[in-house]
Amino acid sequence: MTKTIKYYFLLLIIFFITSCGTREFLGFEKKKIRLEGKRVSILNEDRIKESDLVKSSTNIILEKTTVLNNWPQSYNSPSHLSINHLSESKLDSFKFVVSGTGENKQSKILSQPVIDKNLLFFLDAKSNVISFDLKNNKILWKKNISLKSEKNHNIGGGIVVYKSTIIVNSAYGQIISLDKLSGKIIWKINVESSIRSAPTVFDNKLLSLTLSNKLYVLNGDNGNILWQHQGIFNNTTLIDSPKVAVDENIVIVPYSNGDFFALNLINGKEIWRNSFIDLGIKETTNAFSDIDAFPVIKKDIVIISSALGKLIAVNKKNGNKLWSRDITTTQTPLVNGNSIFLVNQNKEVICLNLLDGGRRWVLPIEKELSDNNKYIWLSPVLINSQLLLVGGLKKLISIDALSGVILRKKNLSNFPASSPLIVNKKIYLMLRNGDIIQIE
């Protein structure tokens, strides 16, 4: 009888020890209180339903096609406004141009190459800045900007052409000026944290946004700091990082905690502040509130999106909200004419009316093209009045911008690292394996 009692007593002890919450019961931990409110997914998984967007009755108007001779910075514009590129490409074949080091688990390519006077400059996955002569088909110089102690951790960074120099935002927390012809260092400054996006150039100023949500504005000639602006640090962030947008005398700064500011370009004085959290986008802030897509400015309208699941338009001068839509994208929207083209939830391409956010068309992307939506689609570009979309499972898609109908599908040799760039009617694309190809 005594043995039986001891046996049951032992089972009772084991039950208490192994039960969930025992550490709280015994006083080793404070009792966890379940927070009130509805539990929501960090990222909404639903596609846009037909009823979710008001249908626009206006027609799509695209700008006339234009030929660019240079591509000095990402999206070729400090405002990130897209043009309708004229190209001779038939989207039939691919020609190898040049190659750098490709990605691995600890090294990522996050920015576009740039082109100036037939010279192609790009940053590979090992932080090599490479200059390539497109006319003579040869590498002119290569400069490694990584730190000796951290050569295996190259996530992001970006480059821009500034006068006779190449400005590099380094993943190692440096902003570096290189001579465009030789690659020699002209000046460099240290900043407090890594930079994953390229600089924005405007009015002889360089604007670089760090991973710690600090904006540095430098004199492009000598690297002197003109002013700085600090946002709130966010320790839950996605891998990409946005660029600031500039138009006239206003700088639109997106921070990874969901805040975005309009600052005076001359002195950094705050003009207005807004936030996706303040706008009531979500009932919880315990999520990815990242703004990874670049803000886009057209006249007095700013288009900005968050991973929390909202696309909004605000007035550039006062920050007042013009409209908002339940759309989730980490890729920069394409704004041209009276329309916005973007990828929602990595599942569909949407065309919206710029003025009111009304839906013009929605194109679901076949799951097979991205292995059941596993692989990301990058920002579309507008070429010959067609949307060119790259990403998914090594795919290239051409879409009629007026109707949303797929015109062509092609397989790529590798995953794209950035959206295409178009110079002198030629289309170039950087791949994650370090190759740059021409789409012919």
Predicted regions and their residues:
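Extracytoplasmic beta-rich repeat domains
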Residues: 90, 94-114, 142-160, 186-203, ...
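Loop/turn-rich, solvent-exposed surfaces of beta-rich toroidal or solenoidal domains
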Residues: 342-354, 358-399
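Hydrophobic beta-strand positions that form the internal "hydrophobic ladder"
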Residues: 120, 166, 206-207, 251, ...
